[in-house]
């Protein structure tokens, strides 16, 4: 095995072990992701197999690459899973706003923390575009039939966003969602030559072509204004 692989493998095992230690501990009420980063697809299976009954009574919050884990948890029937700010957001300018929002949801299930369209009878879910595209067709893919699916992106060129949205809207299960909403796509690198369409134009195009309803814009993204989107419903079941 190459030497460079050992530290990564060790970190991977440590991350899974640390997650399970907290998730299965009765004395904790929530698991709040510190950051996204890469590698969650490598630990998700071990984590999901190792979760015990106390883990089902917790709230889980994160976004970006953590969406792999959130998807797996939701597929496994966990009821308090949400896309929203992470601890690392404190490092952004004005990041304390995002952190307060996360804590208000985790501690009090405060309704003002939610993305404004969340609520009512419609189920919801939210993902980073690249993450959702890459988990489709895997054991982590949850059943999103009838859900409003909100999507956001960061640091991906428009041609990649286009390709990912093609893949998402072509999926048989995604064709049964209630519709797609587009959050913010931040820090898009320039295309050379220019792609010629904005992120909203691209999303509208693939919704129209696939027959998936376009439901407008969502207040989520890789930024301090990232609102909370619970998977399935508008409130934490233990609130």
Where are the model-predicted features located?
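ATP/NTP phosphate-donor binding region
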Residues: 1-27
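N-terminal glycine-rich "phosphate-gripper" loop used for MgATP/nucleotide binding
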Residues: 32-41, 63
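Short, acidic/small-residue loops that bind anionic groups at enzyme active sites
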Residues: 48-72, 80-86, 213-215
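Glycine-rich, charge-decorated loop segments at or immediately adjacent to ligand/cofactor-binding or catalytic sites
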Residues: 67-78, 223-230
